[in-house]
């Protein structure tokens, strides 16, 4: 419920949104929900979370990252969920356009959703 709500809020920006924990994609809003929900996250996404920094696609197709193996969409932007000083997951936006660069508003929406989830988990 909490994860689905956060994914829905980000999805209103007309992209596929997801929320994951450190192992699996927990919630997806937008196209690809069935393909992505409950799949194991990719190693690059895991490394992004461990870095504890937001991610923005560089807009070059050969440098795109997948949220899980074989995903039809790539990461546009993502932010780690940091609760109590620990990385508990991430929130992100996905796109089919491998050359897309995220807008500032999209990155901020993802960061706000991640901060919101972190606050909810701490309470």
Region locations from a protein language model:
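Regulatory sensory and allosteric helical modules in signal-transduction proteins
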Residues: 22, 34-68
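Regulatory loop-to-helix N-cap segments in sensory/regulatory domains
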Residues: 95-108, 120-123
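Short N-terminal helix-loop-first-beta-strand/juxtamembrane motif that initiates sensory/input modules
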Residues: 9-25
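Short amphipathic alpha-helical signal-transduction/dimerization elements
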Residues: 53, 111-122
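Single conserved hydrophobic/aromatic residue that forms the stacking wall/gate
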Residues: 1-3, 7, 11
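Short hydrophobic/glycine-rich mini-motifs in sensory/regulatory modules
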Residues: 81-91
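A short beta-strand signature within small-molecule sensing/ligand-binding domains used
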Residues: 70-80
């Amino acid at each position: 419920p909490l994860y689905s709500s956060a994914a829905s809020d980000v999805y209103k920006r007309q992209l596929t949104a997801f929320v994951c924990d450190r192992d699996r994609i927990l919630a997806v809003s937008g196209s690809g929900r069935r393909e992505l929900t409950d799949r194991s996250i990719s190693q690059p996404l895991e490394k992004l979370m461990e870095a504890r920094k937001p991610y923005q696609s560089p807009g070059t197709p050969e440098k795109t990252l997948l949220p899980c193996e074989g995903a039809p969409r790539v990461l546009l932007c993502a932010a780690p969920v940091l609760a109590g000083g620990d990385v508990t997951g991430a929130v992100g936006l996905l796109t089919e356009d491998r050359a897309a660069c995220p807008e500032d508003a999209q990155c901020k929406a993802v960061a706000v959703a991640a901060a919101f989830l972190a606050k909810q988990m701490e309470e």
